[in-house]
Structure formats: C-alpha cells, structure tokens
Amino acid sequence: MASIHLPIRQLVEFLLRTGSIDSRFAGFDRANEGARIHRKLQKVAGEGYQAEVFLSAEWEACGIAFTLEGRADGIFTDENGTVTIDEIKTTTVPYEEITEELNPCHWAQGMVYAAIFSSQQGLDALAVRLTYYQVDTDQIQRFTRQFSRQQLEQFLQQLLTQYAPWAQRQLDWDTRRSQSLAALQFPFAEYRPGQRALAGEVYRACRAGKSADRKGGTRVFCQAPTGIGKTMSALFPALKAMGEGCGAKLFYLTARNTTQAAAEDAVARLRSAQPGLALRSVTLTAKEKACLHPDAEGHPACLPEVCPFANGYYDRRKDALAALLDGSGSFSRAALADTARQFSVCPFELGLDLSEWCDVVIGDYNYLFDPVVHLKRFFDAAGDWLFLIDEAHNLPDRARAMYSAQFAKSSLTEAKRALGKGKSSLKTALTKADKVFLAARKACAQAAPRTGAEPAGETEPTQVSLLPAEAAPDFALPEPLYARDGTVFLQQLPAALPAALRAVHTPLQDWLEQNPDDPAHAQLLELYFALQDIARAADRYDSHFVTQLTARGSELELHLLCLDPAPFVDASLAAGRSAALFSATLTPPAFYRNVLGCADARAVALPSPFPPENLGLFCLPGISTRYRQREASVPAVADALAALAKGKTGNYLAFFPSYAYLQQVYEAFAARWPDIPTLVQQRSLDDAGRAEFLAQFGPHPANTLLGFAVMGGIFGEGVDLVGDRLIGCAIVGVGLPQVNPRQEMLRRYYEEQSGCGFDYAYRYPGMNKVLQAAGRVVRTPQDKGVVLLLDDRFAQPDTARLFPPHWQHIQYLPGTAALETALKGFWDT
C-alpha cells in the first residue's frame, strides 16, 4: 500500500481554510507572542496537564496509508474524568466576537488529535476544548465539545477521503518522477573538462546525506573555474540522487536574479533533452516583483477590499494549484502570473503554496538563511532537503546583513510628530525611549568627539588605534573597542537601548491595531518593523556581534552588526540532508568554510578546463594604486589601458576599486585618447540599465570599446560575454575593501579568532573580487583573451599565493612598452 507523510495542520488548513489574504497590521510578532502565551497557559493549567504532546499514527483511507503527525497543545482529564484535548489559540478578534464558530480549522485540528489519541488509548469518548486568548485584553474564552470515538474517527476518515485525490496525485507524481530521474541523461553530448568531477562531488554529497547525522547533514565546497558549466554540473547529479531516494526536494539558492535564470535555463535544457521528463520546478520571486495589483507607490497592497487577487484567495487556490499541477511542470514568474490572472489569486502566495508540490525550488538565499523571511513551511524543522548554494562567495556578506539590524533615533522623534497633539501611552513610551537615545547620543559624542579627520573609506588598511574613552555621565557606555569622529564600537550591547525600544513595542502594536486608517499608520508601521529587527538581533546578540553607535548632529544610529554569521548559517544548513556550496572563487577554502560554519566540510578545487595559452596574463608591478598614490598613478594606468585596447580590436572592460578612482582615470583616458570609444558604469543602474550597458558589447566588433566598471559591482561577476564579446579586462588594484571602522571590527574579530584578521577582512575578499572580474574573460574552450593586473601587490607573495593554478604563467612586465610587445606576441600566436 502506498504511504504518504502528512502533518495534521497541513491536512486541516489545506482542506478547510477559506477567506482572503489580509496583511493589515495584526501584530507581526504573534508567532513568538503566541508561543509565550501557550507556555504561560500550559504552566498554570495544573499538575495533570500534559503540554506539547507529540502524536503520530498510521491511518488508511482510499487505499493510502497516511502517516499523520502533530503536536497537541495540551491533554488533561477534567473534573468529570473526561480526557480532553486542549487547542490553544491567540487572537486579536475582540473578546465579545469570539464564538465557537470563529474558525472551523481550530475544531478540526483538535478533533484529529482527539481521534488519534482516543484510538491509541482505547477511549470511547473524548472532549475537545478550544482555549482562545485575547492578546489585547488578556481575556480567555473557552469552548468544549464532547465527541464519541466513532464520531472522531469518522471525521478524520472524511478529511482523509477529501485529501486522498491530492495525496494520490502526489504519489503518482513521485513514482513518475523517480522513474524519470532514473533515466535522466546528461543533456550534452559530452562533459566539459572538470564537469564530471564537479558532478561527482555533488552526487556523493547528496548520497551521503541520506544517512548523515540530521544535526548537520553533509556539506561540500566546490571551486570550479568560470565557464565549466557549474549550474548543470550541480543540478544534474543532485536530481539523479533525488531520483534514487536521496532527497525529497531540491532548493537551488542564489544571490542574484541572473543566476536564478541560469538555473531555470538548466532545468529547461534537461526537459528539452528528455521529452516527458517528470520534474516540477518553481521560481520564487519577491512579492514586490510578483505583485499584479500594487498600490499607487508600487508596493503590494494585500488587503481583500483593495486587491482582487487577495480577496478570496483561499477559496480559489486549490483550483489554481490543480490547473498548474496538470500543466508542464515549469513554473516561472510569468507562468505563475498567467495562472494568477486566470483564477484571480495572488501569484506570490500561489508560488509559495505551489512549492510544496514541486521537486525543485529556485530562489534567493533569503528563503533559507534570512531569519525573518525564510520558508517556515520547510525550514522550521529539519527535512529531507537538498541545498545547492550557487555563487557561494557572496554568502558571507549576505548572511552578515541578514542577521544585523539598525535603528535611528530620528524615527522616534518623527513618530511623535506624526501622532500630533494629545497624550497617549504610545507618546509616553516614545518620549522615554527618545530620552534614552538622547543620553546615549551625548555619551557617544563625548566618547568620540569629531576631529574633522580624513573620511572613512578613503585610506589603505593599516592598524587603526582602538582607544577607549570616557562616557557621558548620564549614560554609561561600556568600554569602547573604538571611539572616533562620533562613532563608538562596543562589544557589549548597552541594555538600556533595546529595553527602551521594547517598551515602545506594546503600545505601538496596540495603536496600529486600533488605528488602521490613520494617516500616520504607514509611517508607524515602518517604525514597528525596525523595532522588530532590533529586537530579533538583540535576542541573538552574543560574541559574534558588535554594537555601533554613531552620533551625527541630533541623530543617533544604533547598529547591531553580525561579524561572524557562521553559527547561523550552520543552523540553516542543518535543516537539510546535504548542501553543496559552489563558486568560481572560494579561495582559500578554509576561509569560506570557517565564515560559513562548515569547518569540517569537504572542499575541492577543480582545474581550469581551458588551454592556458588561451589566456594572456600580464602584470605591471611598477604601478601602485594605494589610496595615497592613486592620483599619481592615473597617467600610468591610463597608458596601460590604452596599450591594452590598442593590442587588438575588440571589447574590453577595466575594473576599478572605487567609482571616484574610475572617474579620475576615465577623464584622463578620454582626454588623451578620444578616438577610443568608451563606456562608463553609472553609479546606480536598474536591470534595464545593466542590460543596455552589456548590449554594447556585441559580437564581431568593428571598433574597439573600453568599458569602465567598478570591481565587485554588477559587471564584476555574473556577466557571460562569450566569444569576442569580451576579449580582455584590466583589473586596477587588488580589490581590498575600503577601510572603515566596521571593516576594522571584522579584522579585530578574526585576528582574535584565528590570527588572520587582515586576510579575513581585506585580502581574501579583495582577491575574490579580482578573480571574479578576471573570470569574465575566456568563457569557452574556443575563447582567447587577456587579463591585465595593475598593482605592485600582485607581485607580492601574500597575494600571489592566492592565484589559481591556471595563473602560473603570469608575466610581470617592467612598463607599458613591454606590455605592448607582450600583447602583440600573444595576439599574433
């Protein structure tokens, strides 16, 4: 008999949930508050009250064996000797409007628990009690119903009978998928050099994950050069392993939309190579981009009275899902939008619901790693998941940002102003918090007086003195790690700051619930979100964080900065069976394993598949691009770029460590060589602007084009200009992050951890940007191109040791004349 695992809550909500999506404010931290209230009620329930009772049972319906699992809030025996299942719900519904029929799902959930418990305990009758806790008034309303064991079992049987067609659909699909994946062939005539090795590493990791310790699963880091075909090399073996029972679902997670498109293309290639392939894939798109009915400002307005796609969503979603599941199996943003319009449902929520029925889920890193927006339906507990983490070199900085938070004192002042005249508990709380932040601002300004020194970010990395200073008398700052120019860094978070903000939380929440139509609602809602972010970060705060306070005029900015995301990334990856993290630049591997919480993971580095003679690699070590030498370096850099561009007609890119330096060199270059066409990256570009820039780099150019871009920016990685669309690039400088106090905190932290502070904070991230930029050249075995390195530090051992093996033929040249000769020799061969 076929069997299927089915969480009880999923069963009930899928069948019985009705109504609309309604994102109006109702307390966005109700999950945590609800858990606290559950514990509170369970604690006072009495000695015989069993809390959080796990229930599991095998139940047959329509020829399917359902494995049902769930957790009853409480089980107790009442004064009449009747065993009672207690289902606790928190609600913002006014107390007088709480009725027995408030939500049929609540009764159904309790009744399913009761059916299982009565069957297993041999009880002829059972009671189900709904306990509603009104969070605004702390009032409790209880309803109790008596059921016979026969009634409960009949009810459960009816639910499973209703669900059986959906279960059978999934079982049939699983069988088709397994058979289809077993027959899946690599979609190209042959593997590129290195592809088979990468595929083997991913396959072995997925296979090992089947029997791995569920506390972490198996993990592998794979560095594979650009052009090897990493997307297919990771996706294909993971699907083969999944077809062998080594995973129920595959999550392909990326840092950028362009990489998501590559994953979609790889799935499409597999389908075209094997017609009839049974594989469902969905791409999750941010709500703002997926929304079909934004408000006047372009934001989603998820209210039933405003959005027709939100109104009645849960009444129509099963029809929309059925239509999709009967279709092609490829669910892109466009496909979801088409179905959403057809059935008048929200495409964003439809994508989330559809993901439960799909084999491959493609999306951003945040769907796994972000503590706020991660997919709770999958990752709140460990599951049989496979993770493919693309462009994993981006994950450390992204993860740090996800676990950090910031708050500005001015948001308190502006909130008070928005409330207008009159007294209220919210105004009182805002005033008190504002006073605490005012005292902290004064203490910060006194501890770190402004000196008018050189702006942060415009120096080279050197040892910054971290000197403690005296705090203001009315706010005791802990001993600073750093204090300069209005900015203080602290290891210890001053408890008074999060405490003052927490005191605002409840009255603000009450105000938002009671004043949904107030003109200030949107502004105060933003304040609420900021308070939530700070509260979450404060709850996580430990030795992996530092506190930054910055005083500017009347403003005080509070930042809780995650320096080391390792434990949080580790916990997220532990939700799955296996994880393969891959990129063209994971050098050195120990650095990435350590900062991503995978110190014991296997790491492999694959050689370049391309002939080394196809890459001309040259360096002019006579040029220094350090900040204090940049102005003097401009003529030499411009001369080197001219030599590069004149070496052969074609398209080139020059990458710079900052936009200001780029502008300096560009102006000098354009003035001296106006006959060479140029293109300059603008400071801010949207997707259309990016596409327009890249479109200038066409195939078979009749004239030379030199593009000026920022290293580490949108053109420094994820750009695939094959053939003669790009035949050379210059990399100006070693890519070190700009010096600022935050970067120095990273240096300090990792110096204490491993003695490698400069490497972890500066050298390794910088070299990553260099290698990514260089990887834009030579994308296929037939390509031929040049990489020119401009900086004396490329000749120093500490930097040169980070070069990949296929860079061993680098030529260090004494000047521009030698470069011209070397380029001629390269292009003539």
Q: Model-flagged regions — what are they?
A:
Residues M1-D78, T82:
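Metal-dependent nuclease catalytic cores that hydrolyze phosphodiester bonds in DNA/RNA
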Residues A57-Q154:
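Mg2+/Mn2+-dependent nuclease catalytic core
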Residues W173-Q223:
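Conserved pre-motif I regulatory segment
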Residues S178, Q185, R214-K215, C246-V361, ...:
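A substrate-engagement module of RecA-like helicase motors
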Residues A234, A261, R341-V360, Y365-A499, ...:
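Signature of the SF2 helicase/ATPase Hel1-core->accessory helical subdomain module
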Residues L336-V361, P371-F378, P507-S624, A632-V634, ...:
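A contiguous, basic/glycine-rich beta-loop/short-helix subdomain that forms a polymer-engagement track
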Residues P621-A632, R683-F794:
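Conserved RecA-like P-loop NTPase helicase motor core
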Residues P657-Q682:
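Conserved helicase motor "Helicase C" RecA-like lobe of SF1/SF2 P-loop NTPases
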